[in-house]
Amino acid sequence: MKKQLFLLTLLTGTFALHAQNKTITVSNSLKIDREFETVELTKKALGLDANAKLENYAIKDKSNNTFVETQTVDNDGDGTTDVLLFQPKVKASSKQDFEVFVGTNPNASKVISCYSRFVPERTDDYAWENNKVAFRTYGPVAQKMVEDKIPGGTLTSGMDAWLKRVDYPIINKWYEKMTSGKGTYHKDTGEGLDNFHVGDSRGIGGIAVNVDGKYYFSKNFISWKTITTGPIRTSFILTYADWDAKGNKITESKLISLDYGSYLSRFETTLTGAKTISVGLTLHEKKGTIGTNLKNGWLSYWEPIDDSEIGLGLVAPKNTLASFDNHVTNETDLSNLYGNIPLKNNKAIYYTGFGWKKGSPFQNKQEWETYLTSFAEKINNPLIVKVKK
């Protein structure tokens, strides 16, 4: 009798385990191969029990029975994982099957390629990176130092670029080099450098509100919250003090994420007090060339930078980039190429980033803008995911 009960228990457990296994089909409707695009799987989409833990699941490519890199994220910070991330490779106009099952990937990456953190040891930056690009922006201590006329501060809500040319993480290494006095990240010793000037400009993706032809913007962020870091995505939230745009009280916060393989960060900005935001790309010394394509939803600026060149870019989802303004002025750092995006339910979604000639495959303006066109096409035609019942 005991043997029968044991066998029944074993069989029941086996059936329950297999019931948790899911096959998903990822379809690519475009005539181009797709990779470095992140698919998000929820328990609901997978048909899993509410008590299931996504961190206990792994994914295999069924065509070759190999494990696929995954990452789980608790988006709302309630202690329960909300999504299981992975980046499938799917050929042009084709489908690919993957198995989601309870298990562990023995080949899981130990490198946190998509990384971000608050940096109190360098005043109070917030910095983020992936295997292609790195960025930072500035906090309240840096602002107060400027206001108190203390050297070393920075007053801006613009987004700074760190021009890396290696695929491994550099944020901690560069800050340690700078704060220890052993070196500087303003000089390229083989990994790249920070020679990108922001000042009062919007840098790469800072926003403004236009009232009667004048642009207004916030000061430095006042609070931050890291949501996730890992092999596929880093994401975090920045909040700003209320600010004034010619009598209009503006509230602003940003959910920013950067995925593996992308040259562009994703921004979801929440803002009240205006109907449209203007997302800026700095024009620096106005020695570069702008590119605009409202139909495909992107703006670009290709310019010289020291002994190289760089492309800056803004991409917005279909029919959301309403217009642009090539705003040129003699005021220091205030010349920006602005993309105007109307808010929907107080939110706007857009992507901004860069491609440095020394640290990317983009060697000229045309190659950079081809990337922006392709990026726009992909976000407007996302991979289609179906769970087989």
Model-predicted regions and their roles:
Residues 20-116, 123:
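Alpha-mannosidase-like glycoside hydrolase catalytic domains involved in N-glycan trimming
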Residues 21, 278-327:
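Polysaccharide-binding surfaces and accessory modules of carbohydrate-active proteins
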Residues 1-23:
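Bacterial Sec-dependent N-terminal signal peptides
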Residues 82-90, 316-389:
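Beta-strand-rich recognition/accessory modules
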Residues 24-28, 132, 254, 265-271:
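Short, well-ordered beta-strand segments enriched in hydrophobic/aromatic residues
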Residues 104-214:
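Solvent-exposed N-terminal domain segments of exported/luminal and surface proteins
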Residues 179-259:
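Extended, loop-rich substrate-binding clefts of extracytoplasmic carbohydrate-active enzymes
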Residues 252, 263-292:
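Acidic (Asp/Glu-rich), glycine- and aromatic
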